[in-house]
Amino acid sequence: MSSASKCPFSGGALKFTAGSGTANRDWWPNQLNLQILRQHSPKSNPMDKAFNYAEAFKSLDLADVKQDIFDLMKSSQDWWPADYGHYGPLFIRMAWHSAGTYRIGDGRGGAGTGNQRFAPINSWPDNANLDKARMLLWPIKQKYGAKISWADLMILAGNCALESMGFKTFGFAGGREDIWEPEEDIYWGAETEWLGDQRYTGDRDLEATLGAVQMGLIYVNPEGPNGHPDPVASGRDIRETFGRMAMNDEETVALTAGGHTFGKCHGAGDDAHVGPEPEGARIEDQCLGWKSSFGTGKGVHAITSGIEGAWTTNPTQWDNNYFENLFGYEWELTKSPAGANQWVPQGGAGANTVPDAHDPSRRHAPIMTTADMAMRMDPIYSPISRRFLDNPDQFADAFARAWFKLTHRDMGPRSRYLGPEVPEEELIWQDPVPAVNHELINEQDIATLKSQILATNLTVSQLVSTAWASAVTYRNSDKRGGANGARIRLAPQRDWEVNQPAQLATVLQTLEAVQTTFNHSQIGGKRVSLADLIVLGGCAGVEQAAKNAGWYDVKVPFKPGRTDATQAQTDVTSFAVLEPRADGFRNYLKGHYPVSAEELLVDKAQLLTLTAPEMTVLVGGLRVLNANVGQAQHGVFTHRPESLTNDFFLNLLDMSVTWAATSEAEEVFEGRDRKTGALKWTGTRVDLIFGSNSQLRALAEVYGCEDSQQRFVQDFVAAWDKVMNLDRFDLA
């Protein structure tokens, strides 16, 4: 062995580098994953701390960018020739697959972060050859730099593609800020092989939150369930997967038909010719995957899905030909050159009606996938499809609206939309709230209102738990929920078990009386919204709890400006998915789940953008404030509830207490005096994890020290303020 291959310190061979070798999770695979609370830190972000993407985007001349995209789409490149001389269909697929990962269950996925650039999404089988689309766009991204994110550029390119082929879009909004590392928090499934479907149990019951039928797909298998060409069964899969991304039946038909009006499928040969995906490709391939040895590997020889052919006679022009073909022919099952199941007109009908994508001397018959056939054969989709066939204007409007929803669903409220093409129409799925149309309360008013709230019969626990319930619906994944709008007083939130409807009604009635008295006393236009008053009540409760603990100078920040949404502005079905099935901060768990309560706590904390220290201090603080659902005493490790003390940590870390589960389920535990056996406390897994997990115990020890009381109060107030304002995009 040469000296160059020897480690300079030990003389042994250098086999691994920093970060390599057996990891903790290899030894303890069930270890609580706190890494998802440390994602996207400034250490991974190359931009300056002062960089403001919204301001950078506003400096962009969007018309210039669009013109560059228009020009690019018709400039075919030899290294990846454009089908029909137009990259528009490829860009539509790229944008669709960027947005189409969104699912309503947890709001994760979607186009909002540009995550198609990273694993695993950049290497999913369903995203084959979309690496070429991004590489084609690189000169435009390079030209405009930080002024437009990849996330925005991919969606804008899809819109430009539609416009360049004769379609009038509903609009476009910028404001999607790029991430710089994969999103490790998103659960895409437990399968270990591409296209695995262990996510199904029983009679094809799809695992909760997942929005695709197989690992590595966006929605459904185009050949049918597990490749079986059954259009009716495919329709059931389509309805479930599209429904899980917030699309109804009409939107589903419009999106399917609208997207398949353009471009073609690629299956010129056996996929055995196709090389590894980008993440598995060679270093010299430079992030390009799926290199094919079939012929030239591109153009007429391209292999992507394995299905081969186009749906319409003019694949680069918006028209109604998709439906004309779907209902104009009778279809029969056949195989593509790659061996994939697809459908062609019976008896050779339609031959020579579709141009070849690259060879002007060749023509073809149209094709349909099994998923397309569901648009005709599914008993619900079929009448919608026939209506669109007979009413092209309805189809165009439905597709425009559904495409806008698809590509903007995870952006949150309209206040985050940027650019000159933001549509004026307010849409119910945007969770609208009224604009502020009154003078806001000032510091003197805030002090007066806090005194009036504390003078009522409401307890610290009631004030804190109501404010928390109002704010904690927020999820950063799709920017939905939060305290703005005061939707906790509306259906469905007012009836959620976790919100303690009876107590909630009492608190709201009391706060409404305070609101009415204050507003009626104003001579001018000054008003306080109930949304603001709910949060202010929580802040007043925290301040009172601090005083109860001997901290008289604590002031919880409060920023007015929330407004009250109406029931008409609130889609009950859409908001139902925000109902917390588990909220470890309130020691609440509805039902039983395959995952542990502590994992659900971390999941919730990640959606709230909390760090591990913030999660820790909030749990400890909310416990001593007696904010559990139903005022359950699990985890209330204090003899002075409603006082903002660090007692939770002091007593959890007390070695004179020994813990044991109360049942085989190991969900509730009793803490008994180690010597006498006397019962001292009860707690849940969410409580005990802060003493059991070594990382969380280290944080608990910080707050359990004798000199940490002031730090605890300060950190709790800061974390509380953060949660109360997560949906205040107007403050950014």
Swiss-Prot record:
There is a cross-link at residues 219-245 (Tryptophyl-tyrosyl-methioninium (Tyr-Met) (with W-96)). Heme b binds at residue 260. Formation of the three residue Trp-Tyr-Met cross-link is important for the catalase, but not the peroxidase activity of the enzyme. GO terms for biological process: cellular response to hydrogen peroxide; hydrogen peroxide catabolic process. InterPro entries: Catalase_peroxidase, Haem_peroxidase, Haem_peroxidase_sf, Peroxidases_AS. Binds 1 heme b (iron(II)-protoporphyrin IX) group per dimer. This is Catalase-peroxidase. It comes from Acaryochloris marina (strain MBIC 11017). The gene is katG.
